[in-house]
């Protein structure tokens, strides 16, 4: 049994899970409009970005490494985990890491720090982990891929504790890249809405700590029940219109869970025309149209490598609170399959949920979680 024993969300919304959940439940969003010229970009954009004067920077570390250290440290502080043990593994989920260093004229950091493995090693040295860290970088599904990897390693006995952190920060390189795809919305995103124009990007670090069994007197209320990654190889940047990969991941991740056990499905919900339509098709094919669906992108934007971890943690907090969080920005259904969305929070007594992500290259992931009584 794979159990969660601690977590943290470190974002522009707040530096603890409790702060983040309370703000989202109140309907707050950290999305802001930034004028042309920000990060030397030629066009205005909307995103959720850190105010870096509020972030505690770690000596000798980049901004990206610093937010990872802040989140991991806050999660570890909730436990008695001995990170120096060779049974404890650190897994970093990120899509771009320190890629901003490629655009930097500062000689402060050596060139190799742009490598994802070097960033992860910097974090493990800070805390004193003895094991070599593992990096999972699998486009937008990185956060679920990392958790599924942790599950499999724990189940195989390769480690006893897995500390999984998902994180990304934004840069001119990233924002201009999404802009070149015409995927960015100039205003706040509207997942699944008929007026949606595209996605917003965001920054965050989120950490979840799993154990193979209850150890050191710590109790885990949440179980990671199942997980699956499926790649339909439809297109390098566009999803399968039929949601083939997502459907197959859902089917595999559902396992023995009955649909009526689910409180909700927390979808990727990026607010792009193709993603939201594809996810609605996959949910329909899986026979889950009666299950409430929500997206959290209207609160944080797309936090990339952090998304799968951050949104899993918030979904756990919502079930703990007996709540289905509303989809900020949603008003009128704008996909062809009648998924069950609402902009408003709703009550629930159910104790399980399904988390979905999809990404470039045709990759798709799904995980099932259940709260233990």
Task: Please provide the spans of the model-predicted regions.
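Conserved small-residue
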Residues: 6, 24, 90, 123, ...
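Active-site-proximal alpha-helical scaffold in enzymes
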Residues: 134-166, 201-218, 303-324, 341, ...
């Amino acid at each position: 049994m794979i159990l969660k024993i601690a977590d943290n969300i470190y974002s522009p919304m707040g530096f603890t899970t409790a702060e983040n959940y309370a703000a989202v439940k109140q309907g707050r969003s950290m999305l802001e409009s930034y004028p042309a010229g920000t990060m030397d970009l030629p066009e205005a954009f909307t995103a959720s970005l850190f105010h870096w004067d509020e972030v505690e920077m770690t000596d000798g570390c980049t901004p990206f490494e610093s937010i990872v250290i802040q989140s991991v440290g806050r999660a570890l502080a909730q436990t008695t985990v001995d990170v120096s043990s060779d049974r404890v593994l650190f897994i970093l989920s990120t899509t771009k890491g320190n890629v901003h260093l490629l655009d930097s004229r500062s000689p402060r950091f050596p060139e190799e720090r742009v490598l994802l493995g070097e960033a992860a090693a910097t974090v493990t040295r800070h805390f004193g982990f003895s094991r070599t860290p593992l990096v999972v970088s699998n486009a937008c599904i990185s956060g679920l891929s990392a958790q599924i990897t942790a599950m499999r390693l724990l189940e195989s006995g390769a480690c006893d504790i897995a500390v999984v952190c998902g994180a990304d920060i934004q840069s001119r390189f990233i924002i201009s890249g999404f802009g070149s795809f015409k995927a960015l919305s100039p205003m706040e995103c509207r997942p699944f809405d008929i007026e949606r124009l595209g996605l917003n990007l965001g920054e965050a670090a989120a950490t979840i700590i799993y154990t193979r069994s209850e150890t050191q007197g710590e109790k885990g209320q949440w179980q990671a029940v199942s997980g699956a990654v499926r790649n339909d190889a439809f297109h390098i940047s566009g999803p399968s219109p039929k949601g083939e990969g997502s459907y197959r991941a859902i089917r595999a991740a559902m396992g023995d869970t009955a649909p009526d056990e689910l409180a909700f499905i927390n979808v990727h919900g990026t607010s792009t025309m193709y993603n939201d339509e594809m996810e609605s098709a996959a949910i329909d094919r899986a026979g889950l149209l009666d299950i409430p669906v929500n997206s959290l992108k209207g609160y944080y934007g797309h936090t990339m490598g952090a998304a799968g971890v951050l949104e899993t943690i918030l979904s756990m907090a919502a079930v703990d609170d007996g709540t289905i969080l509303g989809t900020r920005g949603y008003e009128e259904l704008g996909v062809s399959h009648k998924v069950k969305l609402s902009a408003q929070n709703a009550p629930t007594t159910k104790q399980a949920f399904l988390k979905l992500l999809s990404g470039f290259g045709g990759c798709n992931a799904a995980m099932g979680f259940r709260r233990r009584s």
